[in-house]
């Protein structure tokens, strides 16, 4: 078998209708030719996002906790934000979000992974970056809505991994990003 990877498929789109136009994302209904026939699928048309696993010199991960209405929970997350600035590359979005959400900048950046969050229901792709060499910065960014009472903590990477594996931390972007970061750090340690 060749290198294992997802495969892009370009099907003929017979029709594509905007079913719902939202403030952040839309819902579309596409009919495509597939095999000998056609199929129709509805999905969330999402702008995508960038997220940051920010790890300090003591191997603590910067986490935020905020209310998420669809799940009716205050879940733990890594800093992240929508790719909603035209022409802004994902890395720049990640840098902006790290500053806006937790008043930090980083000296070293590394792309960890890009992932589809729910490919059966939306087209969102999240680009996750590892940030190290953290430093505090002053910002005048005004946090509102869910961000207004956001809690920020630094938690040992090993404890976050334990929380993910035990099912106590269920945010998919946090889980995937932290597990990827832990593996990158493990591989780096093995080569030194």
Segments from the language model and where they lie:
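Conserved hydrophobic/aromatic beta-strand scaffold that supports enzyme active sites
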Residues: 27-31, 53, 63, 128-130, ...
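Short, solvent-exposed loop/turn elements at beta->coil junctions and helix N-caps
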Residues: 15-18, 113-118
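Acidic, metal-coordinating catalytic segment for phosphate/diphosphate chemistry
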Residues: 15-51, 57
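Conserved Nudix-box catalytic region and its N-terminal flanking loop in Nudix hydrolases
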Residues: 8, 41-46, 51-96, 138, ...
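Active-site-adjacent beta-strand/loop module that shapes the phosphate/pyrophosphate-binding cleft
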Residues: 28-36, 118-138
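A short coil-to-beta-strand element that immediately follows conserved catalytic motifs
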Residues: 12, 105-112
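Extreme N-terminal tail/first-helix region
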Residues: 1-21
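Nudix hydrolase/Nudix homology domain
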Residues: 2-8, 74, 111, 119-122, ...
């Amino acid at each position: 078998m060749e290198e294992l990877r997802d495969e892009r498929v370009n099907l003929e789109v017979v029709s594509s209708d905007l079913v719902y136009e939202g403030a952040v994302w839309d819902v579309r209904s596409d009919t495509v030719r597939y095999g000998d026939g056609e199929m129709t699928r509805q999905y969330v048309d999402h702008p995508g996002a960038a997220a940051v696993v920010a790890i300090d010199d003591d191997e603590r991960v910067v986490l935020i906790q905020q209310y998420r209405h669809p799940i009716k929970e205050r879940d733990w997350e890594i800093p992240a934000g929508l790719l909603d600035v035209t022409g802004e590359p994902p890395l720049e979005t990640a840098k902006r979000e790290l500053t806006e959400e937790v008043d930090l900048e980083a000296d070293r950046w590394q792309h960890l992974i890009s992932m589809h969050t729910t490919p059966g229901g939306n087209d969102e792709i999240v680009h996750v970056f590892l940030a190290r060499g953290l430093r505090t910065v002053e910002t005048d960014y005004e946090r509102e809505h869910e961000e207004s009472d956001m809690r920020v903590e630094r938690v040992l990477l090993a404890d976050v991994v334990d929380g993910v594996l035990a099912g106590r931390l269920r945010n998919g972007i946090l889980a995937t990003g932290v597990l990827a970061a832990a593996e990158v750090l493990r591989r780096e340690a093995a080569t030194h």
